[in-house]
Amino acid sequence: MKLYSIDFPLNESNNIFPNSSENININNNNINNSNPNNFINSNTDSELYGNYKPSSSNNFINNHHNNQSSDIHSISQSTPNLSTLISSSSNNNNNNNNNNSPNYSMNSSSDQAPNLLNMDSKLRWNQPFQNQQQQQPTSEVSTNSANTSSENTTCNNSPVSSSTNYIPNNSTSNVVLNSSIPTTSPNVLSAPNKKRQRDDIDCGNNNNINNNNINNNINNNNNNNNNNNNNNNNNNNNNNNGYIDPFYLRDDKDFNNNNNVQLDNTNISQFNDSKELNIKIKKDNNNNNINNINNINNNNNINNNINNNKNLQPQQIQQPQQPQQIQQIQQIQQIQQIQQTQPQQQQQQTQQQPQQQPQQLMSGNLKLPSIHHLEFEVEKNAKKDDSTNTNNNNNNNNNNNNNNNNNNNNIQQANVNTSPISTSTTPNNNNNNQIQNQPQQIPQQQAQQQAQQQAQQKKRKTKPSKYSITPSISLTPTTVTSSSSTNSSGSIGASPLSTSTNIPYSVTNNLSSNNLHSYMNPMGQDYSTSGMLSTTNPYTHHSPNTSSTVSSSVTSPLINQYGTNPTLTNNHSFYGSLASNQNTGASDGNNNNNNNNNNNNGGSGYFQSPVILSPFQKSSNPLNNNHNSNNVYNSSNSHNDINDYISLNSSSNNSYYNSNSGSGMTTPQSLGHSPSHNDYNSNNNNNNNNNNNSNNNNSNNSNSNNLTNKYDSNSSLSLLSSIGDNNNNNNNNNNNNNKSHSSSYYSSMSNNSNPSSSSSSSSSSSSSSSTLSSLNNNNKLSSNNGHIKYEPTSSSNYHDQMSQSHIYQNNFTYYDQSFPHPPVKKTHRRRPANIDKSTLYCHNCGTKNTPEWRRGPSGPATLCNACGLAYAKKQREEETNLHKLLLHSNSYSYHRGNMLESYVTPSLLPLFNTAANVPYLNTPNNASSSSSSSSSSSSSSSSSSSTSSYSSSSYNIPNTNTQYNTTSATSSFKPLTFSSLKTPENTRNTLNTNNNKINYSLNGSI
């Protein structure tokens, strides 16, 4: 029997193993929902591949066509040709002694797998297999070969940058703990799972753990094939529940070797003491790396023991202790389960899924958790730590009976033993311990969750279920006893918000168990093992369970644009982890930056969550992403100010997001997870070169003066308008170093629509502040701003005319002299006392002699006696006739008859001021004034708009627009606008015909 070490290519649709009768289901954690009751195939397709079901449960690994590292197909008889070694060691991992590079030894009895030697062409790795195709029966490879080829070859493609890419964490091992993975039946899985690669084999940091986990998974699969025969092995596989990164390098002290996962002395002591399950990280863990696990013959545990490394033997002596420990822990667990009522368990299940989802939402879901998560029940969680730790161990022991849970248990022990490899700067390697601390669900709860998740998956396979953030009892956070809060890069299930000691809200160990994971991670990549998880970053809001690579949903661009403002402890370690893990040298093929990662801020974790929650505080410091110092912040300052925005697009040279595979999927660029809009992705897809990364950094560096944070400068607008700018402009502009982070929104849109024009349009060096100033300073009537300009239809002094007194001057004062009205005061027919009768004459007949002078219409003593009597009689008759007429009319008119006596002022009469110079009557004066004013205003507006429109690019079509000078710095992509642009001739003509009309002409070339 030959032992073969296997390299897992990150190739799409490379089935390393053809179809073998029996699956070595490499992940019993199959980070999705595998049925804990499915003992035959504990590594169900749902576990490994999220919610996508492979073609067959036996060949679920065959379904990893696209993005998982190696499609290890069901290997009933492990293939002899698989000599490639899975070894990716971080640069810092020199502590691993002999078996640092895990030889994925396969007990091969058949040659069903293709030679891996021929698979280099399909590998996405920048480098072919280096020293790793050593066919060694001993499954041991020197540490140097592993270190040289590990991260460059295996992990060049970060899973985040594209569906096939993997995140090479150079920092500590990121262990994906699906500690209690409620696994669903493999039938639930959807066909897209075929394109998924095996669960996140996160390069670099997770190599030891993943290799250990793969070996454990293979062992578990063998056990699954031999459930009846492998009960002891299942009991031994306490640590198989977690998914360990197969690329994680392992020592010769691998306790997981042989299916029989043996605990270290530290692990045994800790594992025996349920209260001390907060496994303290010991600095000796670097030496306690996982040894390569030889493949187990399907029927013989003895063969497995024979095939295992010599290091396994001392550990095998410890095996009989585990069943007892398991029984004790199971008893404790049963007691706890009895205490927990069934409805509480259901609530826990419902809550665990929501909490699993927020971490899984990390890279691409619009449904973003509220900021409330940042400080969510920290005190309650701190109180729950001890109980949850005991629950975790109890769950691990109970899960030992379940082949599905064996991998998770292996992961925890692997986490205990394995130390973070690459984080030399992080004083305490909390990576593995946080993973251990992740609570594991009770098997009953797993079964319930499994049923729920299966029902949900049947209903909707791609849509995430709504999630609440309330922590479930079973998932109560466990305290990480590590003293430093430099969060371990391996803290996979660890709540991003958790301090080093507390996971603020229960970490969802079922990373891919929920539908959300399949929704957000259709490729099934589990990134929690990858460096994506903020390894030193307790603050990352989500564990990156869901790959942003294939997320169908769009992350909220605004929230992604901002750096988080971690309110908890260790801001330095938080940002240090962001900056240091920003560089994944394998993606760019640059190993030099791998050392810079840990050296910048002392942090080792990626800043994972696209959900970067912050109070949106603008940083006064421009973000200078230096090409050499991969620090996210100003490399010279390396300030870890919380208020600093993390430059979303400042693609540090090795940021795992930079290398794009052109998959058309939202690949968050660099640390800030650029908005996953398809508009922005088009440009990123075009830029698959590593040169773009360096050029982006160079452009950022050259713009250090201009590079006011793209959220800074005066552009409140640039926050919205520059959403896709840095990604598109920096990626597309290899030659444009003058591109400022905040280019206008439309230029970025044009860049997205046409990548060819993006480089040209982005060459404008105007910053967002200049853009806003130009926008504000443009002529108010010009069409540059894209606004429709309206002008008054009448003269500008219209309000003056309204306010003039001519409207009001006659009111109640003007009397028409032609209208008959009585004098202001009546005489009461009183004869004047002193009349000179010699001067009197009758106005009617002219006589001067009369016995009595009577009153007439002209006043007293104007008529002679006869004329006066006749006149009075006539007046009476007329009045009588008038009253008669009024009596026959309506009563209102009769009583209103007084108004005929003209006591009412004439101005109130109906048509009194008909001839007055009121504005609504176009008298010649008004017409002339209004026309002149309107003509002047329209002409001025036309001139200004015409000049401005010609000076600036009018409606740049992205395909044809190569105009570099946007002098007005308005948006190069200007919408259609109707403005009052008119030539003087048109103005004259329109004013002559219609004085009050203004013709709005269409401005802009189409």
From Swiss-Prot:
GO cellular component: nucleus
Biased composition range(s): Polar residues: 71-86, 159-168, 181-190, 411-426, 528-539, 558-589, 662-680
Stated name of the protein: GATA zinc finger domain-containing protein 7
PROSITE patterns reported for this sequence: GATA_ZN_FINGER_1, GATA_ZN_FINGER_2
Keyword match Magnesium: no
Keyword Transmembrane helix in record: no
Segments of skewed composition (Low complexity): 55-70, 87-110, 128-158, 169-180, 205-241, 388-410, 427-456, 468-496, 540-557, 590-601, 619-638, 681-706, 713-785, 928-954
Region (Disordered): 55-116, 128-248, 381-499, 528-638, 657-800, 925-957
SUPFAM superfamilies: Glucocorticoid receptor-like (DNA-binding domain)
Keywords tagged on the record: Metal-binding, Zinc, Zinc-finger
GO MF, any single term: zinc ion binding
Zinc finger (GATA-type): 842-867
Coiled coil feature spans: none
Organism, as annotated: Dictyostelium discoideum (Social amoeba)
GO BP term, example: regulation of transcription by RNA polymerase II
